[in-house]
């Protein structure tokens, strides 16, 4: 059996800790003059279910893209391009 490691012996011995006093401040600070009323959820829910009267709003929808009337879409020449590529590949 090998000699005991001094580092492990020191760890097993432990450390002497000083005593400390803690101040627990986790409790809520509510003054004695503060009184919490009962919350009436039923009346709140009925008020929400009734809804609100909304006024009509005029809108000016500008979300459509502005495309000039003279703008045209060019024809798609993809199939002609592929045919040209196939013809050049066959010639090679």
From Swiss-Prot:
Top-rank taxon, per record: Eukaryota
Record GO terms (molecular function): actin binding
Protein name per UniProt: Actobindin-A
Ranges in a coiled coil: none
Biased composition (Polar residues): 68-79
Lineage: Eukaryota, Amoebozoa, Evosea, Eumycetozoa, Dictyostelia
Domain WH2: 3-20, 40-57
Function: Is able to bind two actin monomers at high concentrations of G-actin. Inhibits actin polymerization by sequestering G-actin and stabilizing actin dimers.
Annotated Basic and acidic residues bias: 13-33, 54-64
Subunit structure: Monomer.
Protein species of origin: Dictyostelium discoideum (Social amoeba)
Start and end residues of each stretch annotated as Disordered: 1-33, 54-92
